[in-house]
């Protein structure tokens, strides 16, 4: 489990590997079930798409990371989730993903 600072660093490092250059090209969210949310509901291609997720210390930490990237212009919304919502995920928005 990681701190907000560690997760922000990991996501920023992974963003540098993307060919996209704007935060608005990405979606940030939090969940308690990465497979369901990222690969199911958002329809992200697990094998060929750009995505990352990290496990936060707790829900409050996950929310701090989410709000950080939303303030930079990523797509997504705050709110929702349960106490076990500790996963922060980010993916590149494409014509096949569902926001």
Describe these PLM feature segments.
Residues 1-99:
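GIY-YIG nuclease catalytic motif and its immediate N-terminal context
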């Amino acid at each position: 489990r990681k701190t907000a600072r560690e997760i922000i660093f990991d996501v920023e490092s992974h963003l540098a590997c993307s060919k996209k250059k704007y935060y608005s090209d990405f979606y940030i969210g939090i969940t308690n079930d990465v497979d369901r949310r990222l690969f199911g509901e958002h329809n992200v291609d697990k094998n060929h798409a750009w995505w990352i997720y990290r496990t936060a210390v707790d829900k409050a930490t996950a929310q701090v990371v989410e709000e950080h990237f939303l303030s930079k212009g990523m797509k997504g919304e705050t709110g929702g989730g349960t106490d076990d919502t500790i996963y922060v995920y980010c993916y590149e928005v494409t014509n096949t993903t569902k926001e």
